[in-house]
């Protein structure tokens, strides 16, 4: 019988940065800052279809850590100018580098939703990182959560889940330099939006990006991205649109307003 493992908590990481960062092998990775059910899998497949951009499945870097033995490895690493936090950054950096080497591409993108909880750490670890903020109407996010296969959560619980992502995502969007996108616009005008993304990343736009089914996107694996029939269709399909925010809680309605949906 398969053993169910607890998922990492959905909260912002508080990290003590006491040691300067080391040089990175990947100088300017790209991180998508987005909630669950926001269309980030479609975005990553479009980007991964570019000849110079590697956008793999969700990497979940924040849950990849190291353990140092007190008085031995801890002291040894400190003599080399590294603590646990910086060692983890070195490991994450190497993972990105290996994936770039394997793909033969130049730019790597990670779209893990959990990035919203470590955006400060990602910015600290990679001062030259680039950020894509992907928004979706809050009702679209909640409705998508409701429609998931096997969903048993109440509407209230799903809204609470969405808020856990929205709060740090909006904080990151207001703090960091980056490019803000809307899922609804990505599906309605994919060429225009992907052109904007390519311009931000400093690469020429390629029409092949829009036909993502013709490129190797990897396997559809649980917990590593969307596996719905919509994404598997290989076609960009219009997102659901919502005329108002009447069904949302007051707190979610505030995000809809802040993001230009009302």
Describe each model-derived feature in a short phrase.
Residues 31-34, 184-186:
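Short, well-ordered beta-strand elements within core beta-sheets of diverse protein domains
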Residues 61, 67-70, 102-208, 219-234:
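PAPS-dependent sulfotransferase catalytic domain
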Residues 1-30, 170, 199-262:
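PAPS-dependent sulfotransferases, especially Golgi type II membrane carbohydrate sulfotransferases
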Residues 26, 37, 187-188:
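Short, solvent-exposed loop/helix junctions and linker helices
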Residues 28-30, 40, 127-128:
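Short hydrophobic "helix-edge" motifs at membrane interfaces and signal-peptide entry regions
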Residues 21-28, 45-121, 125, 230-258:
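PAPS-dependent sulfation machinery
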Residues 33-47:
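Glycine-rich phosphate-binding P-loop
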